[in-house]
Amino acid sequence: MTILVTGATGNIGRRVVDELIRLGGSDIGDIRALTTNPAKAALPGSVTAITGYLGKPDTLAAAFDGGDCVYLAPFPATIGATLELMVQAGVQYVVALSGGAHWADHADAIAASGLAHTQLGPGEFCENFAMWGPQIKAGVVRDISPEHVESPVSMDDIARVAAHLLTAPRAPHLGRMYELTGPVALSRADIARQIGAGIGTPVEVRPCGRAEAEDLLRPVMGDGARWYLDLFESDLEPQAANDNVAQLTGTPAESIAQWAARNRSLFV
């Protein structure tokens, strides 16, 4: 079996590569990693680096050729051409990072492609809360919507699910969209407090307005701060927790406190 991981040097793609190696590496099959610069990718020696970029579909035909399974990182701007190339190459199964809401067109294109697929729809990433790093160091988090309920999931858990799906019998998962969450739903205020618990530091939470929130987040997030805060001015639904990570991998998702403890250097 040949598995191609796209976005293989990105935040989640690289984790998928590492998880495939942990699950068996070459015993699973030929693991290939799509990257724009193989020389700088620093991939493990057992992984075959393939040059290409999802943003330039004309670089992808050779990458998909001979690929049985593909982990598809999200790149909505070229999703139509990318899916067509996978169909032409005879790709047998796609595990795609996707979702609902603003990802709906991307998800719909995958569902309509004719490819055997499973989609993963994570909510808020635990890693997004690194944006609070400077505030948590100061002991006070100011947030635009502290009572909004979320169930953040770590990128490591998302990658574990993707790798397990790529290597497990696929029939039960075909056509599914799995929402991926952490183990418990919390208000954003409680998320901040749980990060504090994970690193052993009390954290106070105060509500704030849009302008103040943007001023606090822009130094960390750049222009992404505006897009992120726009979400809270839309009809953003609370996110309930589920046990899909545990059901799909056999190991429960880590909590935000556990994630913070592993990433303590972001907050102290």
Locate the predicted segments by residue.
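A hydrophobic C-terminal alpha-helical subdomain
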Residues: 211-268
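Adenosine-nucleotide cofactor-binding segment
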Residues: 47-48
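Generic detector of short alpha-helix boundary/capping microenvironments
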Residues: 1, 146-147, 238, 247
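Oxidoreductase cofactor-interface core, primarily capturing Rossmann-like NAD(P)-dependent enzymes
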Residues: 2-44, 55-61, 65-67, 77-204, ...
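Cofactor-binding loops of NAD(P)H-dependent oxidoreductases
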Residues: 51-53
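Periplasmic-binding protein-like
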Residues: 71-73
